[in-house]
Amino acid sequence: MRWRLLGTLALWAGLAMPAVAQDMRPGIAVFPFENGGSYGQDKENFDALQVGMQQMLTTEFAQNPALRVVDRSQIKQLLAEQDLGAAGRVDANTAARIGKVVGAKWVILGGFVDFYGDFRVDIRIVNVETSEILKTEKARDKRENLYAMVTSVSTAITRGVNLPALPRQAMEMRENRKVPTEAVTYYSRALLYADRGNKDKAKELFNRAIEVFPEYTEAKEGLQQLAS
């Protein structure tokens, strides 16, 4: 398995390096979140949050012009090819190797536990060059404040790796944005079904997310990607 992983990563590195070399900003890659044992919701909702929170955090980082953000699809393909991360579990060393392939300076490994609405998020920031865990971040709140927790850990991570903060106006817009957890759940389930190749179900769920939160730009972008 180890040699197969190294061989595939070497091939990917050859393909990825030209594009990465054109962008000198430090790269950051977010891996699927791990469900650490959650109760009070359907299993599918928790499965969906593993990719939903990954994408949400990726989107938050993408608002920062100082960062080059690795697309979730690249991480998904590499993990799938190696049969890794099926349960959301990837160790720091493996994450660092994949991070090097996609030109990331940092890799974000996250997990969550939802105990009947008491929601906790745990984040590890991995230095790709050394495979060391640079810093950990945590957030805990009610499940209904899930989106706010994601924006909070995004800001904490940015500070943790000494990156410039978002411009004040952009930061205020993100912090003041109130996305209902119901919309986040529909959005996450839509991503899950899109990953499974069920475009019709994904489209239905993106639309339901927009019905709950009409300003849900990310869900609208998801619909556009399905149509392309």
Model-derived regions: residue spans:
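Residue-level detector of alpha-helical transmembrane segments in integral membrane proteins
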Residues: 11-12, 25, 58, 207
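A short hydrophobic/aromatic micro-motif that marks alpha-helical segments and, especially, helix-coil
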Residues: 17, 86, 120, 227-228
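Generic detector of contiguous secondary-structure segments
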Residues: 15, 19, 55, 206-208
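An acidic helix/loop motif centered on a single conserved Asp/Glu
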Residues: 23-162
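Positively charged n-region of N-terminal signal peptides that target proteins for export
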Residues: 1-4
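C-terminal/domain-edge helix-coil "capping" segments
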Residues: 22-26, 129, 133-228
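Bacterial N-terminal signal peptides
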Residues: 6-18
